[in-house]
Swiss-Prot record:
InterPro entries according to UniProt: Efflux_drug-R_Bcr/CmlA, MFS, MFS_dom, MFS_trans_sf
GO MF term list: xenobiotic transmembrane transporter activity
Gene Ontology biological-process entries: response to antibiotic; xenobiotic detoxification by transmembrane export across the plasma membrane
Transmembrane spans: 10-30, 47-67, 81-101, 110-127, 142-162, 170-187, 215-235, 246-266, 280-299, 307-327, 343-363, 371-391
Main location: membrane
Highest taxon in the source lineage: Bacteria
Annotated localization: Cell inner membrane
Protein name: Chloramphenicol resistance protein
Any one annotated GO CC term: plasma membrane
Organism of origin: Pseudomonas aeruginosa
Length: 419
Protein backbone atom coordinates (compact mmCIF):
# COMPACT_ATOMS: atom_id res chain seq x y z
CA UNK A 1 0.00 0.00 0.00
CA UNK A 2 1.35 3.39 -0.93
CA UNK A 3 2.25 5.90 1.73
CA UNK A 4 -0.42 8.34 0.72
CA UNK A 5 -3.05 5.82 1.74
CA UNK A 6 -1.44 4.83 5.04
CA UNK A 7 -4.51 5.78 7.08
CA UNK A 8 -6.71 3.13 5.44
CA UNK A 9 -5.77 -0.31 6.72
CA UNK A 10 -8.89 -2.30 5.93
CA UNK A 11 -9.26 -5.28 3.64
CA UNK A 12 -11.32 -5.02 0.48
CA UNK A 13 -14.23 -6.85 2.11
CA UNK A 14 -14.17 -4.56 5.15
CA UNK A 15 -14.01 -1.52 2.88
CA UNK A 16 -17.11 -2.64 0.99
CA UNK A 17 -18.90 -3.31 4.29
CA UNK A 18 -18.09 0.20 5.53
CA UNK A 19 -18.85 2.09 2.30
CA UNK A 20 -21.80 0.27 0.78
CA UNK A 21 -24.52 1.19 3.35
CA UNK A 22 -24.25 4.86 2.36
CA UNK A 23 -24.77 4.12 -1.32
CA UNK A 24 -27.60 1.69 -0.65
CA UNK A 25 -29.45 4.07 1.68
CA UNK A 26 -29.09 6.94 -0.78
CA UNK A 27 -30.70 4.81 -3.50
CA UNK A 28 -33.35 3.33 -1.20
CA UNK A 29 -34.47 6.88 -0.47
CA UNK A 30 -35.84 6.96 -4.02
CA UNK A 31 -37.25 3.46 -4.45
CA UNK A 32 -38.36 2.15 -1.08
CA UNK A 33 -41.55 4.15 -0.65
CA UNK A 34 -42.92 3.61 -4.17
CA UNK A 35 -45.56 1.06 -3.04
CA UNK A 36 -47.01 3.67 -0.65
CA UNK A 37 -47.17 6.51 -3.21
CA UNK A 38 -50.86 6.00 -4.18
CA UNK A 39 -51.94 6.36 -0.54
CA UNK A 40 -49.76 9.32 0.42
CA UNK A 41 -51.88 12.16 -1.07
CA UNK A 42 -54.72 11.31 1.35
CA UNK A 43 -52.33 10.88 4.27
CA UNK A 44 -50.72 14.28 3.69
CA UNK A 45 -53.81 16.08 2.46
CA UNK A 46 -52.29 16.96 -0.88
CA UNK A 47 -52.38 16.07 -4.57
CA UNK A 48 -50.71 13.32 -6.56
CA UNK A 49 -48.71 16.02 -8.36
CA UNK A 50 -47.13 17.13 -5.08
CA UNK A 51 -46.16 13.56 -4.24
CA UNK A 52 -44.68 13.28 -7.74
CA UNK A 53 -42.64 16.37 -6.97
CA UNK A 54 -41.11 14.62 -3.95
CA UNK A 55 -39.75 11.99 -6.34
CA UNK A 56 -38.51 14.56 -8.84
CA UNK A 57 -36.76 16.82 -6.35
CA UNK A 58 -34.92 13.89 -4.78
CA UNK A 59 -33.60 12.72 -8.13
CA UNK A 60 -32.61 16.22 -9.28
CA UNK A 61 -30.90 17.12 -5.99
CA UNK A 62 -28.90 13.90 -6.00
CA UNK A 63 -27.30 15.05 -9.26
CA UNK A 64 -27.14 18.78 -8.62
CA UNK A 65 -25.66 18.30 -5.16
CA UNK A 66 -22.50 16.85 -6.70
CA UNK A 67 -21.57 20.31 -8.00
CA UNK A 68 -21.45 21.46 -4.37
CA UNK A 69 -20.32 18.44 -2.41
CA UNK A 70 -17.62 17.28 -4.84
CA UNK A 71 -15.51 20.45 -4.54
CA UNK A 72 -16.44 20.71 -0.86
CA UNK A 73 -15.06 17.24 -0.14
CA UNK A 74 -11.85 18.22 -1.94
CA UNK A 75 -11.43 21.27 0.29
CA UNK A 76 -12.74 20.04 3.66
CA UNK A 77 -12.10 16.32 3.36
CA UNK A 78 -14.21 13.22 2.77
CA UNK A 79 -15.00 12.49 6.41
CA UNK A 80 -16.74 15.78 7.39
CA UNK A 81 -18.80 15.85 4.19
CA UNK A 82 -19.80 12.21 4.68
CA UNK A 83 -20.79 12.65 8.33
CA UNK A 84 -22.54 15.94 7.62
CA UNK A 85 -24.48 14.31 4.80
CA UNK A 86 -25.37 11.38 7.04
CA UNK A 87 -26.66 13.75 9.73
CA UNK A 88 -28.80 15.65 7.20
CA UNK A 89 -30.20 12.35 5.90
CA UNK A 90 -31.09 11.16 9.41
CA UNK A 91 -32.80 14.42 10.40
CA UNK A 92 -34.76 14.50 7.14
CA UNK A 93 -35.79 10.84 7.31
CA UNK A 94 -37.05 11.08 10.88
CA UNK A 95 -38.90 14.27 10.00
CA UNK A 96 -40.49 12.55 7.00
CA UNK A 97 -41.71 9.77 9.28
CA UNK A 98 -43.42 12.29 11.59
CA UNK A 99 -44.74 15.17 9.48
CA UNK A 100 -48.31 15.48 8.24
CA UNK A 101 -47.64 18.61 6.17
CA UNK A 102 -47.11 18.22 2.44
CA UNK A 103 -44.98 21.38 2.30
CA UNK A 104 -42.72 20.21 5.13
CA UNK A 105 -42.55 16.77 3.54
CA UNK A 106 -41.29 18.27 0.28
CA UNK A 107 -38.69 20.39 2.07
CA UNK A 108 -37.45 17.39 4.04
CA UNK A 109 -37.15 15.37 0.84
CA UNK A 110 -34.83 18.05 -0.53
CA UNK A 111 -32.75 17.88 2.66
CA UNK A 112 -32.70 14.09 2.48
CA UNK A 113 -31.49 14.24 -1.13
CA UNK A 114 -28.72 16.69 -0.21
CA UNK A 115 -27.56 14.33 2.52
CA UNK A 116 -27.66 11.39 0.13
CA UNK A 117 -25.69 13.31 -2.50
CA UNK A 118 -22.99 14.23 0.03
CA UNK A 119 -22.68 10.59 1.08
CA UNK A 120 -22.43 9.36 -2.51
CA UNK A 121 -19.77 11.91 -3.41
CA UNK A 122 -17.69 11.13 -0.32
CA UNK A 123 -17.95 7.39 -0.81
CA UNK A 124 -16.74 7.35 -4.41
CA UNK A 125 -14.08 10.00 -3.69
CA UNK A 126 -12.79 7.79 -0.88
CA UNK A 127 -12.50 4.85 -3.25
CA UNK A 128 -10.43 7.04 -5.60
CA UNK A 129 -8.23 8.17 -2.70
CA UNK A 130 -7.53 4.64 -1.50
CA UNK A 131 -7.33 2.61 -4.69
CA UNK A 132 -6.31 5.13 -7.37
CA UNK A 133 -4.38 3.34 -10.11
CA UNK A 134 -4.86 -0.07 -8.48
CA UNK A 135 -6.78 -3.10 -9.67
CA UNK A 136 -8.88 -3.11 -6.50
CA UNK A 137 -10.64 0.06 -7.66
CA UNK A 138 -12.34 -1.81 -10.51
CA UNK A 139 -13.35 -4.57 -8.12
CA UNK A 140 -14.91 -2.26 -5.55
CA UNK A 141 -16.64 -0.11 -8.17
CA UNK A 142 -18.06 -3.27 -9.68
CA UNK A 143 -19.32 -4.48 -6.31
CA UNK A 144 -20.89 -1.13 -5.45
CA UNK A 145 -22.40 -0.86 -8.92
CA UNK A 146 -23.95 -4.33 -8.65
CA UNK A 147 -25.43 -3.48 -5.25
CA UNK A 148 -26.92 -0.23 -6.54
CA UNK A 149 -28.34 -2.00 -9.59
CA UNK A 150 -30.29 -4.34 -7.33
CA UNK A 151 -31.89 -1.52 -5.30
CA UNK A 152 -34.76 -0.91 -7.78
CA UNK A 153 -35.61 -4.61 -7.50
CA UNK A 154 -35.29 -4.96 -3.74
CA UNK A 155 -36.29 -1.46 -2.57
CA UNK A 156 -40.02 -1.49 -3.47
CA UNK A 157 -40.40 -5.05 -2.15
CA UNK A 158 -38.78 -4.10 1.15
CA UNK A 159 -40.91 -0.96 1.32
CA UNK A 160 -44.10 -2.94 0.68
CA UNK A 161 -43.29 -5.35 3.51
CA UNK A 162 -42.52 -2.52 5.95
CA UNK A 163 -45.71 -0.71 4.92
CA UNK A 164 -47.82 -3.85 5.37
CA UNK A 165 -46.45 -4.50 8.85
CA UNK A 166 -45.85 -1.02 10.28
CA UNK A 167 -47.29 1.58 7.90
CA UNK A 168 -45.66 3.82 5.29
CA UNK A 169 -44.14 6.21 7.85
CA UNK A 170 -42.01 3.36 9.15
CA UNK A 171 -40.26 3.28 5.77
CA UNK A 172 -38.61 6.63 6.48
CA UNK A 173 -37.87 5.65 10.08
CA UNK A 174 -36.14 2.55 8.69
CA UNK A 175 -34.01 4.71 6.39
CA UNK A 176 -33.11 7.06 9.25
CA UNK A 177 -32.13 4.22 11.59
CA UNK A 178 -30.07 2.64 8.84
CA UNK A 179 -28.16 5.88 8.30
CA UNK A 180 -27.59 6.24 12.06
CA UNK A 181 -25.94 2.81 12.09
CA UNK A 182 -23.85 3.55 8.99
CA UNK A 183 -22.75 6.96 10.30
CA UNK A 184 -21.85 5.52 13.71
CA UNK A 185 -19.61 2.96 12.02
CA UNK A 186 -18.04 5.69 9.88
CA UNK A 187 -17.45 7.92 12.92
CA UNK A 188 -15.58 5.07 14.59
CA UNK A 189 -13.75 3.44 11.69
CA UNK A 190 -13.64 5.82 8.68
CA UNK A 191 -10.43 7.92 8.71
CA UNK A 192 -9.81 10.93 6.50
CA UNK A 193 -8.40 9.76 3.15
CA UNK A 194 -7.79 13.10 1.46
CA UNK A 195 -4.13 13.86 2.14
CA UNK A 196 -3.62 16.93 -0.01
CA UNK A 197 -5.75 20.05 -0.11
CA UNK A 198 -7.19 20.64 -3.57
CA UNK A 199 -7.68 24.09 -5.00
CA UNK A 200 -11.23 25.36 -5.23
CA UNK A 201 -13.35 24.66 -8.23
CA UNK A 202 -12.70 26.95 -11.19
CA UNK A 203 -16.21 27.72 -12.34
CA UNK A 204 -15.03 28.27 -15.90
CA UNK A 205 -14.36 24.53 -16.02
CA UNK A 206 -18.09 23.91 -15.77
CA UNK A 207 -18.50 25.40 -19.26
CA UNK A 208 -15.97 23.09 -20.91
CA UNK A 209 -18.22 20.06 -21.48
CA UNK A 210 -21.30 22.03 -22.56
CA UNK A 211 -19.38 23.20 -25.64
CA UNK A 212 -18.83 19.61 -26.77
CA UNK A 213 -21.36 17.82 -28.97
CA UNK A 214 -20.13 14.44 -27.79
CA UNK A 215 -20.82 15.36 -24.16
CA UNK A 216 -24.39 16.41 -24.98
CA UNK A 217 -24.98 13.24 -27.00
CA UNK A 218 -24.14 10.92 -24.12
CA UNK A 219 -25.66 13.13 -21.43
CA UNK A 220 -28.95 13.06 -23.33
CA UNK A 221 -28.47 9.32 -23.74
CA UNK A 222 -28.26 9.04 -19.94
CA UNK A 223 -31.32 11.29 -19.57
CA UNK A 224 -33.24 9.18 -22.09
CA UNK A 225 -32.42 5.96 -20.25
CA UNK A 226 -32.75 6.97 -16.61
CA UNK A 227 -35.64 9.30 -17.42
CA UNK A 228 -37.62 6.44 -18.94
CA UNK A 229 -37.16 4.48 -15.74
CA UNK A 230 -38.02 7.57 -13.67
CA UNK A 231 -41.31 8.05 -15.54
CA UNK A 232 -42.03 4.33 -15.21
CA UNK A 233 -41.61 4.20 -11.44
CA UNK A 234 -43.52 7.47 -11.09
CA UNK A 235 -46.66 6.21 -12.85
CA UNK A 236 -46.39 2.47 -12.11
CA UNK A 237 -47.89 2.52 -8.58
CA UNK A 238 -51.04 4.35 -9.66
CA UNK A 239 -51.38 2.45 -12.92
CA UNK A 240 -50.80 -1.06 -11.56
CA UNK A 241 -52.33 -0.78 -8.09
CA UNK A 242 -55.05 1.70 -9.02
CA UNK A 243 -56.13 0.94 -12.58
CA UNK A 244 -55.14 -2.74 -12.75
CA UNK A 245 -55.89 -3.69 -9.13
CA UNK A 246 -52.49 -5.21 -8.32
CA UNK A 247 -51.66 -5.59 -4.61
CA UNK A 248 -48.72 -3.81 -3.00
CA UNK A 249 -46.72 -7.02 -2.83
CA UNK A 250 -47.67 -7.98 -6.38
CA UNK A 251 -46.66 -4.54 -7.62
CA UNK A 252 -43.29 -4.80 -5.91
CA UNK A 253 -42.61 -8.22 -7.42
CA UNK A 254 -43.63 -7.11 -10.92
CA UNK A 255 -41.59 -3.93 -10.58
CA UNK A 256 -38.63 -6.08 -9.59
CA UNK A 257 -38.80 -8.02 -12.87
CA UNK A 258 -38.04 -4.82 -14.81
CA UNK A 259 -35.15 -4.02 -12.49
CA UNK A 260 -33.79 -7.56 -12.85
CA UNK A 261 -33.90 -7.22 -16.64
CA UNK A 262 -31.82 -4.06 -16.23
CA UNK A 263 -29.30 -5.81 -13.96
CA UNK A 264 -28.69 -8.69 -16.38
CA UNK A 265 -28.43 -6.30 -19.32
CA UNK A 266 -25.89 -4.13 -17.50
CA UNK A 267 -23.70 -7.16 -16.81
CA UNK A 268 -23.96 -8.22 -20.46
CA UNK A 269 -23.00 -4.74 -21.66
CA UNK A 270 -19.54 -5.09 -20.12
CA UNK A 271 -18.70 -7.49 -22.96
CA UNK A 272 -20.79 -5.88 -25.68
CA UNK A 273 -19.48 -2.29 -25.53
CA UNK A 274 -15.79 -3.13 -26.20
CA UNK A 275 -16.82 -5.39 -29.08
CA UNK A 276 -19.42 -3.21 -30.82
CA UNK A 277 -18.29 0.27 -29.80
CA UNK A 278 -20.11 2.99 -27.88
CA UNK A 279 -21.96 4.60 -30.84
CA UNK A 280 -23.51 1.30 -31.95
CA UNK A 281 -24.50 0.35 -28.41
CA UNK A 282 -26.02 3.80 -27.89
CA UNK A 283 -28.21 3.37 -30.97
CA UNK A 284 -29.17 -0.13 -29.85
CA UNK A 285 -30.30 1.23 -26.48
CA UNK A 286 -32.38 3.96 -28.08
CA UNK A 287 -33.90 1.37 -30.41
CA UNK A 288 -35.01 -0.71 -27.42
CA UNK A 289 -36.63 2.35 -25.83
CA UNK A 290 -38.53 3.12 -29.03
CA UNK A 291 -39.60 -0.50 -29.56
CA UNK A 292 -40.85 -0.78 -25.98
CA UNK A 293 -42.71 2.52 -26.31
CA UNK A 294 -44.41 1.36 -29.52
CA UNK A 295 -45.59 -1.85 -27.82
CA UNK A 296 -46.93 0.16 -24.87
CA UNK A 297 -48.78 2.46 -27.27
CA UNK A 298 -50.38 -0.53 -28.97
CA UNK A 299 -51.65 -1.88 -25.65
CA UNK A 300 -53.14 1.52 -24.80
CA UNK A 301 -54.76 2.07 -28.22
CA UNK A 302 -56.28 -1.41 -28.26
CA UNK A 303 -57.34 -1.06 -24.60
CA UNK A 304 -55.42 -4.13 -23.50
CA UNK A 305 -55.70 -3.68 -19.73
CA UNK A 306 -53.73 -6.77 -18.69
CA UNK A 307 -50.77 -6.48 -16.38
CA UNK A 308 -48.64 -8.42 -18.85
CA UNK A 309 -49.57 -5.94 -21.58
CA UNK A 310 -47.85 -3.24 -19.52
CA UNK A 311 -44.99 -5.06 -17.85
CA UNK A 312 -43.73 -7.06 -20.86
CA UNK A 313 -42.97 -3.96 -22.99
CA UNK A 314 -41.33 -2.48 -19.90
CA UNK A 315 -38.85 -5.35 -19.91
CA UNK A 316 -37.74 -4.14 -23.34
CA UNK A 317 -37.64 -0.54 -22.10
CA UNK A 318 -35.60 -1.75 -19.11
CA UNK A 319 -33.06 -3.31 -21.48
CA UNK A 320 -32.83 0.03 -23.26
CA UNK A 321 -32.40 1.87 -19.95
CA UNK A 322 -29.54 -0.38 -18.82
CA UNK A 323 -27.87 -0.15 -22.23
CA UNK A 324 -28.04 3.65 -22.25
CA UNK A 325 -26.80 4.03 -18.69
CA UNK A 326 -23.93 1.58 -19.30
CA UNK A 327 -22.59 3.38 -22.36
CA UNK A 328 -23.25 7.01 -21.40
CA UNK A 329 -20.66 7.89 -18.68
CA UNK A 330 -17.49 6.94 -20.55
CA UNK A 331 -18.84 8.48 -23.74
CA UNK A 332 -19.61 11.79 -22.05
CA UNK A 333 -16.21 11.96 -20.32
CA UNK A 334 -14.16 11.16 -23.42
CA UNK A 335 -11.66 13.96 -24.01
CA UNK A 336 -11.93 15.40 -20.47
CA UNK A 337 -9.51 13.23 -18.51
CA UNK A 338 -7.74 16.24 -16.97
CA UNK A 339 -11.00 17.61 -15.50
CA UNK A 340 -12.85 14.32 -15.08
CA UNK A 341 -14.19 15.12 -11.61
CA UNK A 342 -15.75 18.40 -12.67
CA UNK A 343 -17.18 16.97 -15.89
CA UNK A 344 -18.63 14.00 -14.00
CA UNK A 345 -20.45 16.40 -11.67
CA UNK A 346 -21.78 18.41 -14.63
CA UNK A 347 -22.84 15.20 -16.38
CA UNK A 348 -24.90 13.91 -13.45
CA UNK A 349 -26.28 17.37 -12.66
CA UNK A 350 -27.45 18.10 -16.21
CA UNK A 351 -28.70 14.56 -16.71
CA UNK A 352 -30.69 14.67 -13.48
CA UNK A 353 -32.15 18.10 -14.19
CA UNK A 354 -33.11 17.16 -17.76
CA UNK A 355 -34.76 13.85 -16.95
CA UNK A 356 -36.44 15.22 -13.83
CA UNK A 357 -37.87 18.33 -15.47
CA UNK A 358 -38.86 16.75 -18.80
CA UNK A 359 -40.22 13.63 -17.14
CA UNK A 360 -42.27 15.60 -14.62
CA UNK A 361 -43.65 17.86 -17.35
CA UNK A 362 -44.77 14.89 -19.44
CA UNK A 363 -46.33 13.17 -16.42
CA UNK A 364 -48.23 16.35 -15.53
CA UNK A 365 -49.63 16.74 -19.06
CA UNK A 366 -50.77 13.16 -19.67
CA UNK A 367 -53.06 10.75 -17.77
CA UNK A 368 -51.06 9.31 -14.88
CA UNK A 369 -52.91 5.98 -14.79
CA UNK A 370 -51.93 5.11 -18.35
CA UNK A 371 -48.70 4.15 -20.11
CA UNK A 372 -48.74 7.29 -22.27
CA UNK A 373 -46.17 9.22 -20.16
CA UNK A 374 -43.63 6.41 -20.67
CA UNK A 375 -44.50 6.20 -24.37
CA UNK A 376 -44.09 9.93 -25.00
CA UNK A 377 -40.90 10.23 -22.95
CA UNK A 378 -39.19 7.24 -24.58
CA UNK A 379 -40.15 8.25 -28.11
CA UNK A 380 -39.20 11.90 -27.64
CA UNK A 381 -35.84 11.52 -25.91
CA UNK A 382 -34.71 8.47 -27.87
CA UNK A 383 -35.52 10.21 -31.16
CA UNK A 384 -33.57 13.30 -30.09
CA UNK A 385 -30.56 11.17 -29.13
CA UNK A 386 -30.64 9.24 -32.41
CA UNK A 387 -30.87 12.51 -34.34
CA UNK A 388 -27.93 13.96 -32.43
CA UNK A 389 -26.02 10.74 -33.01
CA UNK A 390 -26.51 11.16 -36.76
CA UNK A 391 -25.24 14.75 -36.56
CA UNK A 392 -22.21 13.61 -34.58
CA UNK A 393 -21.59 10.83 -37.06
CA UNK A 394 -21.61 13.26 -39.99
CA UNK A 395 -19.31 15.71 -38.19
CA UNK A 396 -16.86 12.94 -37.40
CA UNK A 397 -16.92 11.19 -40.76
CA UNK A 398 -13.58 12.61 -41.91
CA UNK A 399 -11.32 9.69 -41.07
CA UNK A 400 -11.05 8.82 -37.40
CA UNK A 401 -14.69 8.14 -36.56
CA UNK A 402 -17.45 10.24 -35.15
CA UNK A 403 -16.61 10.41 -31.50
CA UNK A 404 -12.83 10.27 -31.66
CA UNK A 405 -12.75 13.46 -33.71
CA UNK A 406 -15.20 15.25 -31.46
CA UNK A 407 -13.23 14.13 -28.41
CA UNK A 408 -9.99 15.48 -29.88
CA UNK A 409 -11.68 18.77 -30.66
CA UNK A 410 -12.98 19.05 -27.11
CA UNK A 411 -9.56 18.19 -25.70
CA UNK A 412 -7.97 20.92 -27.79
CA UNK A 413 -10.53 23.49 -26.65
CA UNK A 414 -10.13 22.56 -22.99
CA UNK A 415 -6.37 22.97 -23.18
CA UNK A 416 -6.99 26.67 -23.83
CA UNK A 417 -10.13 27.62 -21.88
CA UNK A 418 -9.61 31.33 -22.53
CA UNK A 419 -9.77 30.90 -26.26
Amino acid sequence: MSSKNFSWRYSLAATVLLLSPFDLLASLGMDMYLPAVPFMPNALGTTASTIQLTLTTYLVMIGAGQLLFGPLSDRLGRRPVLLGGGLAYVVASMGLALTSSAEVFLGLRILQACGASACLVSTFATVRDIYAGREESNVIYGILGSMLAMVPAVGPLLGALVDMWLGWRAIFAFLGLGMIAASAAAWRFWPETRVQRVAGLQWSQLLLPVKCLNFWLYTLCYAAGMGSFFVFFSIAPGLMMGRQGVSQLGFSLLFATVAIAMVFTARFMGRVIPKWGSPSVLRMGMGCLIAGAVLLAITEIWALQSVLGFIAPMWLVGIGVATAVSVAPNGALRGFDHVAGTVTAVYFCLGGVLLGSIGTLIISLLPRNTAWPVVVYCLTLATVVLGLSCVSRVKGSRGQGEHDVVALQSAESTSNPNR
